[in-house]
Swiss-Prot record:
Belongs to the PBP/GOBP family. This is Neutrophil recruitment protein. Residues 1-19 form the signal peptide. Mice with dietary resveratrol supplementation, which attenuates activation of MyD88-dependent NF-kappa-B signaling induced by the protein, are less susceptible to Zika virus infection after mosquito bite. It is found in: Secreted. It comes from Aedes aegypti (Yellowfever mosquito). Interacts with mouse TLR1; the interaction promotes activation of canonical NF-kappa-B signaling in host macrophages. Interacts with human TLR1. Interacts with mouse TLR4; the interaction promotes activation of canonical NF-kappa-B signaling in host macrophages. Interacts with human TLR4. One of its GO terms (cellular component) is extracellular region. Keywords: Secreted, Signal. Female salivary gland (at protein level).
Length: 157
């Protein structure tokens, strides 16, 4: 009975945080309303295509998203594994704390002083279960964002 209430409570929390629409909010904070780069960032986020676009704008955008949802501490840039695991669980996935802790350790060894959302995302991408579940969690969290084609009229080449 307790686990049913916990599941309900966690689902309620993630539904409440969905309303913020983090991708759109971070893009709005980082760019002017009609800035082409803003739409380009949103398109890349929509496609989960963050490679090859290593600009200060992309890093700032990704920092904003990870900090705003609580997956990274702004000051230390440390990954908040517990928060991400809780968000994944609230999104319907099994507890992935152990897997995310392993990914964090691997990431710390590989990237050392260059840790941030781009490196964390890259580490998640190279894990066994990480990419599919992480992307689905984001789709569940950012329903409004992913329900619209963010790449219409955008050329990524």
């Amino acid at each position: 009975m307790c686990s049913i209430w916990l599941t309900f409570f966690l689902s309620f929390l993630i539904l409440n945080t969905k309303a913020e629409q983090v991708y759109q909010t971070c893009a709005d904070e980082s760019f002017e309303p009609n800035d082409y780069w803003k739409q380009k960032m949103l398109c890349m986020a929509y496609r989960f295509n963050f490679y090859g676009y290593k600009s200060n704008s992309m890093y700032a955008f990704m920092d904003c998203t990870f900090i705003r949802v609580g997956w990274m501490d702004k000051g230390t840039r440390k990954w908040n594994v517990a928060k991400m695991a809780a968000d994944m669980h609230a999104s319907g996935f099994p507890d992935r704390t152990a897997e995310l802790t392993e990914i964090e350790a691997m990431c710390n060894m590989e990237f050392r002083n260059k840790l941030g959302p781009m490196s964390y995302y890259r580490c998640i991408e190279t894990s066994k279960q990480g990419p599919g579940e992480f992307k689905q969690m984001l789709r569940n969290r950012e329903v409004e964002f992913f329900s619209k084609n963010q790449c219409q009229g955008v050329d990524l080449d």
